C-alpha cells in the first residue's frame, strides 16, 4: 500500500523501510518489548495495590510476571512443556509491526531508513508496549481504575502510533513538493493505484484476522460468574470477558462498509480515498 502511494523514485526506499522494520522490531520485542508489557501494567509509579490479587507481583514497580518473559527465560525458547507462550508473543509482535508501519506511512518520503529504524524500535517495542500494558492488559491500571475497554486494541495501537507520528511530522515537516513557491498545497496522489488497491485489501484481510485472533482462549467462566456447578465455555477477549466470533464478524464488516460508503461519497468516487476510508472505518 505504502509503496503504491509513494513516488517512483522512493519505491525501493519505501519497500526496504517497511521490510526492515520486521526484523528490527522482532529482535527488540524479544529482548525487552515483551518484558515491558508484563512489567508495567500499573505504571510505573502507580500503587501496586490496584493489581488483581491473582497477579504475581514481584516488585514494588508492579513487575507482574516479568521474570517469566525476559530474553533468558525458559518460556522464551524451545520448551516442550510450554505450548502457547511463543504464539502469544508472536500475536503481540504483529501489533508491534503494525504500530511501526502506521508511523512509516505517516512519514512517507521524509526520512532515512536508519533513522526510521530507530523510530520503529521506539514505537514498536517501547511506547505502544507501555500503552498496551496500561490499557490492553487484564490487570492494566486503565482497566482497573477507569474501566477502559478496547477489545481489539484499536485505540491502544492507533492513538499511540498516530500521536507518535504527529510528533515526528512536527519536526520533519511536509513532503518535498507538497507546497508551491507561493504556499499553495499540491495534491500528491498515489503513483500506482493498483498497488494501493491490492495493499489495502490485504490490510482489510489482515485486520479481520487480527479481530478474530483477539478471541484469545476458550475458558470455563461459570465459576467466575458465580454459576457453581455450571460450565460456561466461551471465547474471551484480552480482559478475560466473554466474546464471540459472530460479534467480531458483524462489527468488522459493518465498520468496513460504513467507511467505504462514507469515503466514496465524500471523495466523489476517488479510489484512493474510498479504500483508505474503508480502512479508517
Regions found by a protein language model. Name each.
Residues 1-281:
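Hydrophobic alpha-helical transmembrane bundles of multi-pass membrane proteins
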Amino acid at each position: 500500500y505504502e509503496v503504491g502511494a509513494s513516488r517512483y523514485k522512493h519505491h525501493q526506499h519505501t519497500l526496504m523501510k517497511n521490510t526492515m522494520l520486521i526484523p528490527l522490531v522482532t529482535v527488540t520485542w524479544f529482548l525487552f518489548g515483551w518484558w515491558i508489557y508484563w512489567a508495567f501494567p500499573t505504571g510505573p509509579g502507580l500503587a501496586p495495590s490496584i493489581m488483581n490479587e491473582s497477579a504475581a507481583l514481584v516488585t514494588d514497580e508492579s513487575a507482574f510476571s516479568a521474570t517469566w518473559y525476559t530474553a533468558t527465560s525458559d518460556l522464551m525458547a524451545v520448551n516442550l512443556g510450554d505450548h502457547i507462550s511463543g504464539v502469544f508473543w508472536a500475536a503481540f509482535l504483529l501489533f508491534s509491526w503494525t504500530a511501526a508501519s502506521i508511523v512509516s506511512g505517516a512519514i512517507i518520503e521524509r526520512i532515512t531508513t536508519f533513522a526510521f529504524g530507530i523510530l520503529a524500535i521506539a514505537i514498536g517495542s517501547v511506547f505502544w508496549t507501555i500503552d498496551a500494558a496500561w490499557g490492553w492488559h487484564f490487570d492494566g491500571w486503565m482497566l482497573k481504575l477507569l474501566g477502559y475497554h478496547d477489545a481489539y486494541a484499536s485505540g491502544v495501537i492507533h492513538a499511540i502510533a498516530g500521536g507518535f507520528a504527529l510528533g515526528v511530522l512536527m519536526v520533519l515537516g511536509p513532503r518535498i513538493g507538497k507546497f508551491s513557491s507561493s504556499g499553495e498545497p499540491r495534491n500528491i496522489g498515489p503513483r500506482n493505484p493498483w498497488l494501493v488497491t491490492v495493499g489495502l485489501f490485504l490490510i482489510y484481510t489482515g485486520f479481520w484476522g487480527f479481530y478474530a485472533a483477539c478471541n484469545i482462549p476458550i475458558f470455563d467462566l461459570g465459576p467466575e460468574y458465580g454459576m457453581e456447578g455450571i460450565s460456561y465455555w466461551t471465547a474471551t477477549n484480552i480482559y478475560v470477558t466473554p466474546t464471540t466470533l459472530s460479534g467480531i464478524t458483524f462489527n468488522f464488516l459493518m465498520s468496513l462498509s460504513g467507511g467505504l460508503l462514507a469515503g466514496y461519497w465524500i471523495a466523489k468516487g476517488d479510489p484512493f480515498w474510498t479504500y483508505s476510508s474503508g480502512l479508517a472505518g
